[in-house]
């Protein structure tokens, strides 16, 4: 198991209203040549390990934002998702320094003092190696629905605001995330989003990727898959712990044509009321957030976003709680699920990255298919590389299952157990490549998940999760 090294806290001076390019600039991101993954501008694979911090710009001081970002950098998160025009009265409730984001509810009149604070947070995140997944606005500002609103966007001012943002953050390490938890319900909604995207492109010259954050149990592909500005699909598979009817949709987006990368930008949060019904179902725990990590990755996602129910809203006891957070954000950042996300990243990065594909046929269907590959919370999923040098099977529960050994090309197969709870790998043995073989996880508890890793022995890959 590798040991975490906390990154040094870099003090970043804000020398102008517009962030300036410096030696610490993060490389821009682009879509890989096979259209399945993200890579840096020099072609290195990029693992999206995101955290939802929707109210970061709106509610946090620089000191608290810095502490939060340092925590996430130490846990090897690579993206933080935050909103410029925030959800919770973001147009009328000022930020921690008393500044509103725009004047007169007019997106063409941004408040420089508010955005100087955004500048500072973006620069601090970038200095720590974290990209900001920047939402120009939460969705209630263009489709009020259940939010506070008001609806302030038109196609015309959305384009102007987008271009202004694009110019301001042209050199920053960001990804643009349009939308904000709202559906497209008419042509005007689509025109607003499209205009904002085109404005961003004009402003930053195409420097940054663009996606769309949809409402629950939906994906950007529903409305925008064929649009040129949409670089990759983002899903919100939602706050359910069930694979069936939720996380199975990641592979449906993976299979769409034309090919575009896909990521789950909002799965079930840790400590969240399960399916929004705490009285009946309680709150989610670490195992509930680990499962979607592997379900999504092994279904073809290029990364994954985590969230904690207290952290996204940066709840403290002096604030009105939204949907029953369990603890203040300062405590919630230490919840176990957050630390366990990095083990999924380490596992994927320890094997060839850009050739990975989902392959459920690695798993032998049990006599009772609802047992293996299973349904609900207990779905087994598998992935491998196109050269058949390795395969991985995620077992969400300690249940015996069988695999096709010839999913691997080598004559001899080295097998490992990888523990998603602590990132350790244990060698099982070396086996001939023939027939089907049953494996039983080391522990058989309900919340004790495991990953079986099968390697072509001749490749001499390091232990799963180890850095090359």
Which residue ranges define each predicted feature?
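Bacterial N-terminal signal peptides that target proteins for export
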Residues: 1-8
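Aromatic- and carboxylate-lined catalytic core of secreted/periplasmic carbohydrate-active enzymes
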Residues: 44, 261, 270-272, 285-429, ...
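A short, sequence-level motif marking secondary-structure junctions
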Residues: 50-54, 408-409, 432-434
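Bacterial Sec-dependent signal peptides at the C-terminal "C-region" and cleavage site
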Residues: 13-25
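Active-site mouth of glycoside hydrolases
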Residues: 26, 31-244
